[in-house]
């Protein structure tokens, strides 16, 4: 049994009692990376020398019994800036970018005395559902190396599933925490929009992006969200909501819980094995005293189209800053200022990023704004209202995290429409801004299936309670890939 088979709480107790040291944990992390990284490719940049130094310092100082995360190794998605540690967003255009400040979540993790093992691979600028659009390399699913880990936080999920780190941070714009968590058999939380500061997150779509934790189990996830939540003056969209002790909500008692199951989430396009795993999970929750009814989120069908217009429009604006002038890659082949802009961007961005910038620029252009962007915003309002209406009568909404299990590497990369439509069960949650968690709920043909539990605004505590109660009745989260 390795050290990472223990939970956050168990490792904390061992550290306080000096049965193990932070140096032991960091060493275990790098030993595991050495053993499996060539197979999975979770990381872009490792932080070995610094991590070992921090671990020694923490060990010498002793672990504060009140600091649950002190001395524990974490991986951070490479679109979250880290001072003096290369941050690339998995793009050639930021290949050598060395930030001069930490993202707010990174500062909070440093205050919590976690130890950053390195920066995790992702789809370029978080645009993708498979971690195949990274400029550096593809990441492989630890459960089946011929398959994708999901995306865009594929490295964050694969590193946890492969035991390279204890937990990680990802970001979720349209499912980028929940879908990889489902594909890799781990737990991923997308918090309510505004719960976690976005300061220092390299922007994709600012009205949709949210940082969240990926962990082996629900309790660890709750501890990590406690550490990174809270109002931040540097982020005007962060909300002044008290930081709850989410870990206190893990009581196991869900008697009387009212669950809504959208008929749109278990209909056409959902793999039979995925559907069966979700229905079995609902039976487990019924045994625990919950009840469920079929409900409708009638505007879900507009989710993917609305999302790709709105997210691409915001991306076309956000990514205009990468022009070869201030930072990042600069084309050596330019002779005029206009050439500098065009060549830097055409050489520095990958195909998927360029596709979305062009789509967004088109949607915002004169004559098309009303037909596309404005209509997508109107559809977004209707999608949000669907959730508001269901939550009047139900406590949570439940469905699959993804309509399929992990697909083959190169299986969809040349078919963007099919890839986009695979996000159908996650993008409505981002459009509405509500929280959702993915927890392992079974297997289909040997591949993990994720159960998505969706809550009302700022009801992460309830999501943790339900997810934890389910987890305690099952063993799916204890299953490990055979690497």
From Swiss-Prot:
GO process terms (BP): translation
Record's catalysed reaction(s): L-glutamyl-tRNA(Gln) + L-glutamine + ATP + H2O = L-glutaminyl-tRNA(Gln) + L-glutamate + ADP + phosphate + H(+)
A cellular component term, taken from the record's GO annotations: glutamyl-tRNA(Gln) amidotransferase complex
Active-site residues annotated for this sequence: 77, 152, 176
Keywords assigned by UniProt, alphabetized: ATP-binding, Ligase, Nucleotide-binding, Protein biosynthesis
Molecular functions per Gene Ontology: ATP binding; glutaminyl-tRNA synthase (glutamine-hydrolyzing) activity
Disulfide bonds: none
Domain of life: Bacteria
SUPFAM superfamilies, per database record: Amidase signature (AS) enzymes
Statement: the UniProt record of this protein carries the keyword Ubl conjugation: no
EC number: 6.3.5.7
Keyword Transcription among record annotations: no
Pfam families: Amidase
Subunit composition and interactions: Heterotrimer of A, B and C subunits.
Role of this protein: Allows the formation of correctly charged Gln-tRNA(Gln) through the transamidation of misacylated Glu-tRNA(Gln) in organisms which lack glutaminyl-tRNA synthetase. The reaction takes place in the presence of glutamine and ATP through an activated gamma-phospho-Glu-tRNA(Gln).
Family per record: Belongs to the amidase family. GatA subfamily.
Entries under HAMAP family matching the protein: GatA (MF_00120)
Designated name of the protein: Glutamyl-tRNA(Gln) amidotransferase subunit A
Classification of source organism: Bacteria, Bacillati, Bacillota, Bacilli, Bacillales
The gene coding this protein: gatA
């Amino acid at each position: 049994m390795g050290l990472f088979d223990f939970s956050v709480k168990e490792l904390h107790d061992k550290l306080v009692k000096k049965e193990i040291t932070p140096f032991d944990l960091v060493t275990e992390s790098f030993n595991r990376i050495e053993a499996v990284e060539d197979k999975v490719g979770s990381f872009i940049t490792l932080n070995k020398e610094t991590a070992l130094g921090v671990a020694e310092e923490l060990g010498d100082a002793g672990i504060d019994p009140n600091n649950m995360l002190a001395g524990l190794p974490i991986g951070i998605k490479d679109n979250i800036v880290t001072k003096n540690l290369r941050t690339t967003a998995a793009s050639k255009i930021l290949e050598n970018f060395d930030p001069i400040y930490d993202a707010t979540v990174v500062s909070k993790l440093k205050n919590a005395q976690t130890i950053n093992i390195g920066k995790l691979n992702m789809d370029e600028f978080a645009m993708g559902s498979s971690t195949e659009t990274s400029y550096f390399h593809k990441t492989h699913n630890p459960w089946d190396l011929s398959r994708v880990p999901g995306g865009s936080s594929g490295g964050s999920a694969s590193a946890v599933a492969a035991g390279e780190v204890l937990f990680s941070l990802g970001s979720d714009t349209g499912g980028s925490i929940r879908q990889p968590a489902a594909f890799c058999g781990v737990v991923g939380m997308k918090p309510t929009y505004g719960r976690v500061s976005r300061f220092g997150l390299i922007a994709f779509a600012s009205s949709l992006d949210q940082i969240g934790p990926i962990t082996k189990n629900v309790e660890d996830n709750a501890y990590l969200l406690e550490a990174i939540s809270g109002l931040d003056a540097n982020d005007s969209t962060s909300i002044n909501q008290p930081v709850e002790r989410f870990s206190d909500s893990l009581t196991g008692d869900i008697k009387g819980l009212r669950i809504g199951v959208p008929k749109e989430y278990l209909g056409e396009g959902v793999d039979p094995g995925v559907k069966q795993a979700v229905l079995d999970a609902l039976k487990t929750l019924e045994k625990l005293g919950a009840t469920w009814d079929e409900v409708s989120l009638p505007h879900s069908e507009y989710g993917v189209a609305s999302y790709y217009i709105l997210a691409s429009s915001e991306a076309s604006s956000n990514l205009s800053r990468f022009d070869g002038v201030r930072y990042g890659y600069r084309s050596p082949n330019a002779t005029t200022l206009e050439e500098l802009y065009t060549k830097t961007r055409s050489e520095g961005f990958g195909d998927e990023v360029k596709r979305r910038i062009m789509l967004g620029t088109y949607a915002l252009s004169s004559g098309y704004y009303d037909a596309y962007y404005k209509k997508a915003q109107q559809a977004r309002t209707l999608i949000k209202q669907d959730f508001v209406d269901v939550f009047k009568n139900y406590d949570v909404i439940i469905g699959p995290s993804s309509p399929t299990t992990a697909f083959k590497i190169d299986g969809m990369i040349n078919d963007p429409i099919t890839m986009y439509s695979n996000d159908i069960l996650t993008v409505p949650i981002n459009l509405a801004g509500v929280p959702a968690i993915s927890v392992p709920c079974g297997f289909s043909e040997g591949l993990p299936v994720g159960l998505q539990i969706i809550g009302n605004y700022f009801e992460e505590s309830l999501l943790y309670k339900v997810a934890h109660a389910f987890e305690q009745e099952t063993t799916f989260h204890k299953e490990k890939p055979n690497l």
